[in-house]
Amino acid sequence: MEALKQYIRQMIDISEQDLSQLLSTATTRQYKRLQLLSSPGTVPNEIFFVIEGIVRVVITDNEGEEHTVHFAIENQFIADYSGYILMQPAMYSLQAVQHTAAIVLPRAAIDWGYAHLPHGQKLGRLVAEYYFIYQDHRIKNIYARTPAERYNSITDVFPNIHNRVPQHMIASY
């Protein structure tokens, strides 16, 4: 939990009491290799903060082929954000690529933070801005780079990923 506390403190000014209240319903969960953190078809009600391991965001096309949309490594948030925000069934699977530990923030904690923290809205905005910029870069990479260039540049965003993730997952990215 300390890694998440440190992350939040770097983003906003927050009292120890408010931080404790925000994280009072958060839990740390362990996920085995290839275990799902969340599945398509269910409304996401949690946001995950990776403290150890790697999570892969996967979408499966109509032919059953998996496509890696995103990875999350240590000290990053991950969720099916569209499903979470719109309160609609998820389109993505979140899968632990290796043994993964994540802090799970339930919707109630996030909602409490927005409503009660002096800088709760700012925290949410900063996380959303990070994810928006990541997705924008991802779209540019898909359309402006060759597959080889994308493969070679993935370490800019995810250091050491070639040693941590099977090649077929990187190739589908």
Report residues per predicted region:
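Short phosphate-coordinating micro-motif centered on Lys-Gly-acidic
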Residues: 37-42
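Short, Lys/Arg-enriched N-terminal segment that forms or immediately precedes the first helix
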Residues: 4-5, 131-140
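Cyclic-nucleotide recognition modules
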Residues: 68-126
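Short beta-strand segments in beta-sandwich/barrel cores
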Residues: 27, 54-59, 77, 101-102
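Phosphate-/nucleic-acid-contacting segments
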Residues: 145-173
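Glycine- and acidic-residue-biased ligand/ion/polar-headgroup-sensing regions
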Residues: 34, 45, 49-56, 74-75
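Alpha-helical bundle regulatory/interaction domains
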Residues: 1, 109-110, 124, 131-133
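Cyclic nucleotide-binding regulatory module and flanking cytosolic helices
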Residues: 1-27
